[in-house]
Amino acid sequence: ATVYGWGASEEILGRALKDYASRDEIVIATKVSGSMGKGPNKSGLSRKAIMNEVDASLKRLGVEYIDILYIHRWDYNTPIEETMCALNDLVRSGKVLYLGASSMYAWQFAKAQYIAEKNGWTKFSVMQGHYNLLYREEEREMNQLCKDMGVALVPYSPLAAGRLTRDWNSDSKRFKEDKVAKVKYDTTEESDKIIVERVSEIAKKYNVTKSQVSIAWLWSKGVTAPIVGVTKEKYLYDFEQALKVKLTDEDIKYLEEKYIPHNIVGHE
């Protein structure tokens, strides 16, 4: 996304692509709407903000087009008609191939899709929501809506900020310092602890890692591609090996049955 490191993440990716990859073999996704500076056109989903940010992203990435452009959050200050028209124009221009949305309410996503369909504009193909074994509120409406519309699910935080990868009482620097993760997960610790322990039990049962069990659970839910942070090579290996883990219906029930409803987080 543009806001990650104020564009630095896009610049780093662009240099890596130039040195190590063929553009045709890579799928590049980025986001718009986050604040990139002061002023009315430095954030949000107005036509001007979208066009400016996409041009800036293309320059930082050093490419001619973006494969998937996400709107990072819903913009309550811009009519959705203006946003969808601008996004459609980007697709028509060839600067963007597909559109995605992230972290919003189901009624908002349905409205955006309706506006696009009514006007003959490009609709969203991907939904990037917050979804994992410790946060399953997307199952209430969004996941079913996407399934009905044929929209791919590409959830972020599939490992709950690492909580699903380690024993409950273990410690880490991120666990201590990640304030955003604490807001997301630290209000339901009693039930979350049981779920994490059960992930560990299933991992031992199949002689795999806890990460692989957590990702395999997502595969069982019809997810297309969980977004996994790959800061180390072994994390990529875990992601790949999770494809081979086949959970039974009993496993899935065991992992899910202690879940309790959570407050909605991430949409604002």
Predicted regions and their residues:
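Conserved, mostly hydrophobic/aromatic
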Residues: 1, 13, 28, 57, ...
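A short acidic, helix-capping loop that chelates divalent metal ions and anchors anionic groups
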Residues: 35-41, 164, 237-238
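N-terminal binding-site loop/beta-alpha segment at the start of enzyme catalytic domains
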Residues: 1-27, 92, 267
